[in-house]
Structure formats: C-alpha cells, structure tokens
C-alpha cells in the first residue's frame, strides 16, 4: 500500500496539484483514501473539487489533539493516529495524507507535518507557488528537522535528488506535467520510527495468535503489561500465581485481566505431569524424583514446562529473577536448536527513523571465532523475523587490513566460518562502527564492500563492547532498546531486565509471540 503526505505550503495552488495527482492515481488504484489525522486542519483541501468524491477520514478531533499535546501525551496522540491509519491501509490501495497549512495550531507546523509523516512512513510532498531558491531553502529546512525522508516538493520534480529539473508552479497552471507526477509516484520512503515499529510488532503478532506465559505475576509491572496486552488482543496470556490474589491486585490497580488465564502451580493438575517429565529429562544428570517434584512448583520451571510440553508457546521472565535463573531451566529442558551450540542475544535498537540489530549484548562474555560466527548467523535470522534485511557487520577497532592483532584474527576467522556456513549472507569485517554505518566513511575505507556503510546487523567482538554500545546508544540517542531477545533455543524464552518498564514487557511479549510463529 502506497501513500503520500501533502504539505500545503501554499493553499492557492492546491486545486491544480490535487487535480493532477488524482488524474494519475485513479487509473492505477481502485480504492483511494483521504486521511486527515487531526480533523479540522485541512485548510484549502475543502476547496479542491477533484477531492470532493472521496471521503475524508480522521483519527482525532483538533480539540482532543490539543488536550493531549498540552498534557504531554503526544505519544498517545500518535498511537491513535497510527491505529486509524493502519485500518485505512487494510481497506485501501493508496492513502493521500492531508497535511496542515502554516496557520494550523499556530506553531511549529512543519514539525507536525514531518513528525506525522515519519510515523506513517509517507514521503512528504510540499505544494507551493514559489521560486526555485525558496524551494531549495524549504527542502533544507525539512532536512534540518530530522526528516530526510521528506523528499518531495510538488513543483514539477521531487527532491529525492540533490538537483531540480524544473521551475516553480504558477497559480494559473491547470495541472502539473505528467512526468512530474510520474516521478512523484515512484518516490519511496523506507523509514520506521520506534512507535511505528512497535505498531508493526502488534500487527505481526495478531496474524497468528500465540500464548505467552508470564510467571512473575507478583510484580505490578507484569499485571499492567498484561492489561495492555489483553486490550490489544495480539497474544494469549497465562499468569502464574494465586488467582484470587492476582484478581484482587488487578482490581486495586483498575486493570482488566478478563481474558487472561491464571494457573497456580501449587494446585494445578499439571503439577504431577511436570514432575514426572522433569525427572525423565534430568535423571541422567542426577535429579531425584523428590527434587523434580520440588522444581515443578518453582514458577520459572513450571512456566518452562508449559512451553516445553506445548501448553504455551513462549515464556517471558526476569523482572524479579536473574538472567541465569531465567535461562537455566530453558537450557536444561528446552535446549538449543539442532545445529546451534549456544544461546546468544540481540537488542532491536529503534532509532528515530530506522531499526538496527545489536548482538551479543547480554549472554556470551568472550566468544570464540566459531561462537562469533554462530552469533552472526543467528542474529541475521532474527533480523529477518522482524522484516529487517540483514547486512551483517563484524565490528572491531580497525577496518579491513588497517591493523593486525589477536582481535582482528578472531574476526577474520569468524568471517571465513560464516561465509562457508551461509554463502548467501551479506557479511563483512572487521569494520569500525563508522565504516559500517556511514557511506562516506565506507567509500574511503572499504569501497568494495557490500555491507560497509549500510549495515543493519552489528556483531560486537565481546560482551564488554556490546553491552557498553547498546546502553550508550540507548541513552545518548534516546533509542528504544527492545531486548535482550534470546536466540538459539528450541522454543522462545526471553529475559527481562529487572528495571524493565511496562512498555519493555509489552514489547518483549509481542516479540516472543512472533518468534513462536516460526516453531
């Protein structure tokens, strides 16, 4: 589904612009929607006769939007808009997003246009009657507003390229040149904001509902996350604990757990089955029947057994337990996938306009070349699960052949192993971080690399580097760090930080459900 965001910098020329746009769209698309995210702000669009046959859809009225902004609830405003936009996407082939003229809200209007367009991943098209120099200045302003995706100016040519191919649009013109419209429709925006990525997780999880068990129901963060997930309807949920106590706490917190299954390990009919199964699995390791019965009452082991025996599809734990306490039962019971020798982790780093994969940042302290290669291949597979095309950079303090040493040898060996295991995977190294992400630096340091300058998956040489890096990016760039996401297990078990926020828990549960779709 395609879309454009029209910014009416000059409302007097909207008629000509809209007429030309619809003339090009109607032969190509049967279902075209007009979307004004905040109603009452589309000044000038109402006078465009060519749009009169199309219904205008909105997400929220202006007064409510102002209330949310004035009370610092912008994220709720954008979530409301994204939800309505997703509904339109499912029923239409093309969405024309109607932007806001400079008088709307009487403040930072271009910011509103570019912020919303970023969340909707829609190229911005500015309709203007002005000089070429002014248009160039306007484009520069858009770029300074951190919206590099805002690449269209509806004046005969898009601004995807650094030069202009034609002059300004005169008010008297009845329509734009066909070539300008054609160029415009070829414009693509490939950005994703943290909010849009989180929405995509919800949509992906809903395609195939999976059941996730949360053993730490004594923590109100878990209950609040369960409430949000319950309203979302994207996953099935199991909470472990005393039903009466959980419902009482939920009532005190004004939470809705109506569709959430609650199991008490102490009284569950699964108790005997789990004890027997645990004993059979671990008796060769010296586990006695009495110890198996005791472990079956432990919430983490009980939750792991629910997943192992197929009563749940995934488990999320860790707000009140260490990583070792979460992973140990999984390693003992669920074990690793065939051909995989270790469990590693990645973080999905949601920056302003893109999502990167960082690994390993939580599990393996000092991976060998073989382990580093395995982390790289499993991280690439994880990236694919979340629609991130993997271009893998093996990171180091040096790029290419610019240095020698034990670390460089380790990365070169890991690269050779990966290339033998998966010849189709786009991977390169050693690469410094700037060479892996910046095309200008890459052109100088690794001009023949297919990965340098455009990496999406970043593999750190050890846990020290990985953990420091993800926290540095999270804090300094205000990125949303989703994870750690465990990879390599036979079934999804994921660990939470003990400082996890409700939003972190929601994201991890959605990711676990999505992982379970591949099992």
Swiss-Prot record:
Please provide, alphabetically and separated by semicolons, the GO molecular function terms listed in this UniProt record. Answer: phosphate acetyltransferase activity
Q: Which InterPro entries match?
A: P_AcTrfase, P_AcTrfase_dom1, P_AcTrfase_dom2, Phos_Acetyltrans/Butyryltrans, PTA_PTB
Q: Look up and give the organism this protein is from.
A: Helicobacter pylori (strain J99 / ATCC 700824)
Q: What is its EC number?
A: 2.3.1.8
Which key words tag this protein in UniProt?
A: Acyltransferase, Cytoplasm, Transferase
**Gene encoding this polypeptide?**
pta
Cysteines paired by S-S bonds = none
Sequence similarity: In the N-terminal section; belongs to the CobB/CobQ family. In the C-terminal section; belongs to the phosphate acetyltransferase and butyryltransferase family.
Q: Which reaction does it catalyse?
A: acetyl-CoA + phosphate = acetyl phosphate + CoA
Q: What class of enzyme is it?
A: transferase
GO biological process, alphabetically ordered: acetyl-CoA biosynthetic process
* Annotated compartments: Cytoplasm
Location (main, coarse): cytoplasm
What superkingdom heads the lineage?
Bacteria
- Return the protein name: Phosphate acetyltransferase
Which stretches of sequence are listed as region Phosphate acetyltransferase?
196-519
Q: Which GO terms describe its cellular component?
A: cytoplasm
Its annotated pathway reads: Metabolic intermediate biosynthesis; acetyl-CoA biosynthesis; acetyl-CoA from acetate: step 2/2
